[in-house]
Structure formats: C-alpha cells, structure tokens
C-alpha cells in the first residue's frame, strides 16, 4: 500500500474574534499613533509602534491572544504557558507594506486585523525552503498546492487573528486603497 507522509508541517492557526469592537480599537490605534514616534523594522512607509504589551486599551485583545495561543498549542505541544513577549501596531496607508521578515526565536507570532479596507493587501507566507522550492519546481506545476507552492497568500480581514511559527518568513502586500488605512496589531509569544 502506498501513502504520503506529511512531514515538517507548518501550521497557521486562524480564528475570528467576534467580541472585539474594531471600530473603537481602530480609533484608539490612530489616536495612539499621533503621540508615539514609532519605529521602522519591516515596514515600508506607514507607522509601526513601539512595544504595546502593557497598553491598557489592548488588554481584552491580549486576553483573546492568550486563549488562541493555548488552543494552537494543543497541536504544537510546546511545554509551558504562552507569554506575550512583544506587541505593536501597524498602520499602513496607500502603497505602504511590510517587507519579507520573520520573528526569530519566538515560539509563535501573530497578527490581528483591526481595519481592512478593500484592496488593502494580503499577508504572504513563504515556504521555509523558499529558494529551493522555487528553484526545484520553477513554475512547472499544474496548480499550486501545499506540496509545491513557494508562497501562500491569506486574506487580511478585520476581526481575523493569525498565529504562526516565529521562524516563518512572511510579508504584507501594499495597501492599494487610496483613502483608508489598514490597521493591524502584531505580537510575539514564547512558552515558559
């Protein structure tokens, strides 16, 4: 009997957080960005805040993140409890984006989408062996699938939370909406 063994799987957990008031949260994020100088890490244009893990208006989101990490870890099976290591917001105007990057040695990383206008861009995850997969298959596949795709696009959608391994390279496409900003909150988690 023949069978395929799926090895070295890369899980991406997603859930909709229905109990977050995104309209209010978006306003709080915009207000906060007017007082905080921010930083440049992977963002090309736009605003990226400094660490927000102790900012009061995010406390309910932090609680939801903790629950989601605990749920995701049932499959990951890491020892210990999830500890939020860092949290920051991203506000992306027209053509602003995030270059390919990863979150290093963090056990899990994630993003929560607060505001996502039409044409705001997707999040793109690269295969861990991106260069080899791209070279090996060199667009010779009939259809992209989990075995042959060098990258995978997932939608940026308000209320959606993604969790993924911190080592996974990813980027965010440019926001092509000329009038409304894309707002997301990203974070890193380790287990202890």
Give, region by region, the residue ranges found by the protein language model.
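Catalytic core of Fe(II)/2-oxoglutarate
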Residues: 144-192
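Catalytic core of non-heme Fe(II) oxygenases with the double-stranded beta-helix
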Residues: 93-163
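Non-heme Fe(II)/2-oxoglutarate
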Residues: 1-79, 97
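A generic structural micro-feature
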Residues: 7, 81, 102-106, 177-181
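A structural signal for short, well-ordered beta-strand segments
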Residues: 87-89, 110-112, 185-189
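A short coil-to-beta-strand element that immediately follows conserved catalytic motifs
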Residues: 77-87
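UBC/E2-like fold recognition across ubiquitin and ubiquitin-like conjugation systems
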Residues: 12-14, 23, 30-38, 55-58, ...
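Short helix-to-loop capping/linker segments positioned immediately adjacent to catalytic or ligand/cofactor-binding
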Residues: 75-78, 96-100, 111-112, 170-174
């Amino acid at each position: 009997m023949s069978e395929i063994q799926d090895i070295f799987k890369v899980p991406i957990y997603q859930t909709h957080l229905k109990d977050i008031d995104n309209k209010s949260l978006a306003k709080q994020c915009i207000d906060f960005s007017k007082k905080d100088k921010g930083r440049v890490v992977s963002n090309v244009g736009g605003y990226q805040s400094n660490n927000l893990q102790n900012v009061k208006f995010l406390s309910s989101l932090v609680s939801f993140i903790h629950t989601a990490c605990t749920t995701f870890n049932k499959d990951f099976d890491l020892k210990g409890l999830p500890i939020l290591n860092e949290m920051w917001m991203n506000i992306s105007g027209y053509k602003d984006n995030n270059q390919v990057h990863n979150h290093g040695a963090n056990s899990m990383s994630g993003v929560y989408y607060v505001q996502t206008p039409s044409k705001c861009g997707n999040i793109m995850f690269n295969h861990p062996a991106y260069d080899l997969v791209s070279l090996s298959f060199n667009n010779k596949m009939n259809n992209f699938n989990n075995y042959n795709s060098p990258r995978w696009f997932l939608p940026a959608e308000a209320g959606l939370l993604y969790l993924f391994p911190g080592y996974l390279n990813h980027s965010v496409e440019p926001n092509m909406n000329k009038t409304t900003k894309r707002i997301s909150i990203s974070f890193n988690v380790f287990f202890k």
